[in-house]
Design a protein with these regions (language model features):
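Bacterial Sec-dependent N-terminal signal peptides
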Residues: 1-32
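Residue-level signature of the cytosolic catalytic core of signaling kinases
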Residues: 47, 51, 67, 122, ...
């Protein structure tokens, strides 16, 4: 039965029917040196090695995915890379306005620019995949006894109306606090990129009502993680960016990963700088990465391939705002989740356990831990994962605790090119 299914999958892939819908100076503390291993080509593996046939199929799959994927993807187990690919371009169409007027001649011109090609080291906005770093920072403070999961928001921000909401409820999206994406843009100071500090001020002044009683429901809301980033900065007495870099990224050996605020030169200063607008919009800003990151950072694109300008909300961190590449994400997964090098194992286990149990004792259909989602798949076991969508970026990060398998897609073109592909890869690997 498994052999038949294997042949059907291979036939499916081969048929072509694949609608795959610091700017600042680093401190004296050095990044850990981490080298990732690469698996040998399939034809060099012994015929008796069960990985040989799978590698051949994975290679074919990778080539077909590349027909539509604008981005990178990687398949790894522990610190060994099985397959990794980079496809497409940093920018498709330069013009962020006049979306109806872009032509494929423009795209062809961009394709001829060698410096415009995506590589495996290209940095992508992780969007909500960033949340696992915020959760890890919170858990690190808990492990260091500087914070408790039962601490209330009132302890840190007494002027904010959600005073009885706990750290755990923020981590698990059970706080009832409303989504800041939905606030009227007029509540912000729109002469600048909007920061976590400004968001906290807006919450204190506007006193928006809760959308449900804390603990009563699970609703994925980005405000929770933006608040957590502000709390990390306050408790650690360090900028959020610095705390994460020193305590998470350096021990993991993530030398390339940065925050949006570093990419565009907002960190550690210039946060009050006036920025030009796109089409007189309060929301979008006409700004590009600083020279240090030119040619290293992908720009997001909407479904019509038009360039997505930077949003003023980009500089709110915690819920998003991390830029990374596939190999740095493998280093992170190994250091934090697999080897427990960043936090004691007990805290890592808490992060990947379902934690969003409601006050009535019920578990929502969507299981959420600390910064990650989880699902029990009948054929593949428990997988830990998170997606990310933001201003033209579309990402998926998946990790399986039972064998250290990792599947990561990072894309800067929201054409759904890798939707559902993790399940197909798991089918190949588990046959």
């Amino acid at each position: 039965m498994k052999r038949t299914r294997y042949l059907l999958l291979l036939l499916f892939f081969c048929s072509g029917f694949l609608f795959v819908d610091c700017h600042n100076k680093l401190s004296a503390n050095k990044f850990k040196d981490v080298e990732l291993a690469h698996v040998l080509p399939a034809d060099s593996l012994p015929p008796s090695d069960p990985l040989r046939d799978k590698m051949d199929t994975l290679e074919k799959y990778a080539n077909l995915v590349g027909e539509r994927l604008n981005g990178t993807f990687i398949i790894a187990r522990h610190d060994t890379i099985w397959v990794e690919r980079a496809y497409g371009y940093l920018e498709l169409f330069k013009d962020p306005t006049g979306y109806g007027n872009v032509t494929y001649n423009d795209l062809a011109a961009r394709k001829r620019e060698e410096s415009n090609k995506i590589t495996l080291s290209t940095l992508f906005d992780l969007a909500s995949v960033s949340k696992q770093f915020t959760a890890a920072a919170v858990l690190k403070l808990c492990a260091d006894e500087k914070l408790k999961l039962t601490d209330s928001l009132y302890r840190f921000y007494p002027d904010i109306p959600y005073k009885n909401v706990t750290i755990k409820q923020l981590l698990t999206h059970t706080s009832g606090i409303p989504e800041y994406f939905n606030f009227d843009f007029g509540v912000y100071d729109t002469t600048m990129f909007i920061t976590n500090e400004q968001l906290m001020h807006v919450l204190a002044v506007q006193k928006f009502p809760v959308i449900f009683r804390r603990g009563a429901q699970f609703k994925y809301v980005n405000t929770n993680y933006a608040i957590l980033a502000a709390i990390v900065a306050k408790v650690s007495e360090m900028p959020f960016e610095e705390y994460v870099r020193e305590n998470l990224w350096k021990p993991a050996g993530m030398k390339d990963t940065r925050f949006f605020t570093e990419i565009v030169g907002l960190y550690p200063s210039e946060k009050s700088k006036d920025y030009p607008l796109v089409e007189k919009s309060l929301e979008y800003v006409d700004v590009t990465p600083v020279e240090e990151y030119a040619g290293k950072v992908a720009r997001g694109h909407w479904r019509n391939a038009a360039l997505a300008p930077y949003d003023r909300l980009n500089s709110i961190l915690g819920d998003k705002g991390v830029y990374s590449n596939v190999e740095d994400m493998v280093k992170w997964t190994n250091a934090f989740f697999i080897n427990a090098e960043i936090l004691p194992r007990e805290w890592v286990d808490k992060a990947i356990k379902c934690q969003n149990i409601l006050s009535n004792g019920k578990t929502p259909a969507e299981m959420y831990g600390y910064g990650v989602r989880m699902e029990e798949k009948p054929e593949h076991g428990k997988v830990i994962f998170h997606g990310g969508l933001w201003d033209g970026f579309h990402n998926v990060w998946l990790y399986r605790p039972s064998d250290g398998l990792q599947i990561i897609f990072l894309s800067n073109y929201y054409n759904r090119a890798h939707t559902g592909r993790c399940d197909q890869l798991l089918d190949i690997i588990d046959l």
